[in-house]
């Protein structure tokens, strides 16, 4: 457990990433507008080995992050932009690249994933509600290569992402309107889309329904070895495991 004043952690962090290649733990701190990096074996009141923080970083509202350890880059979504830093960035340092501007359609980005093999970055968007997909090397005020949005998508707000590079598929957790108040089971879902999807496209497969026990799904991760998908639920305060193979076969709805 990493805890204590020297950690520079605040009361909440909504994401975490483990860099297996370099044995490091990366955590966003939205209240401090920072990204904190710890040694993989850090424990107790351990100070971060690096911290990206300061006015030159342009970091704000940074609930999530994504790590690309193929190209040694760290990707941070903010309210109206995507910031790309060197993985080893430290201190008050400017991003290597910024994807931002009216053409990007980015507004209150929530959830992010990077596929360094197929060179895409996917983020959840609040307005229009949906998923924006950019080329990994995009920079400046560029339009997304595709935008998944519309009533058929079922998207009210996206929260977490995972990618399947070999199949060029994107997994997204989707929270339904008002479920944190109503506590209704089965309205939110986990959807699967192709990278090539564009416009008002329904998910090709979904984990949805009362038997899923989902209320407010957040993070998602895929275990390729055991063909399982893991989903965290905020309201249920639970960690669910589903069959990835059955989902793709259309048996799990």
Show the residue positions of the predicted features.
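Beta-propeller fold detector
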Residues: 1-4, 46-54, 93-101, 142-150, ...
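Beta-rich, blade/repeat-based domains predominating
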Residues: 5-21, 55-73, 102-118, 151-168, ...
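Residue position within the beta-strands of beta-propeller blades
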Residues: 27, 76, 123, 172-173, ...
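Short loop/turn segments immediately following the C-termini of beta-strands
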Residues: 30, 40, 79, 87, ...
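A detector of repeated loop/turn-to-beta-strand junctions in beta-rich toroidal repeat architectures
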Residues: 32-34, 46, 81, 93, ...
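Short loop/turn segments immediately following beta-strands, especially the blade-tip
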Residues: 38-45, 84-92, 133-142, 192-200, ...
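Short, conserved, GDST-rich strand-edge loop motifs in beta-rich repeat architectures
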Residues: 174-187, 242
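Blade-level signature of beta-propeller repeat domains, shared across WD40, Kelch, NHL, RCC1
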Residues: 219-253
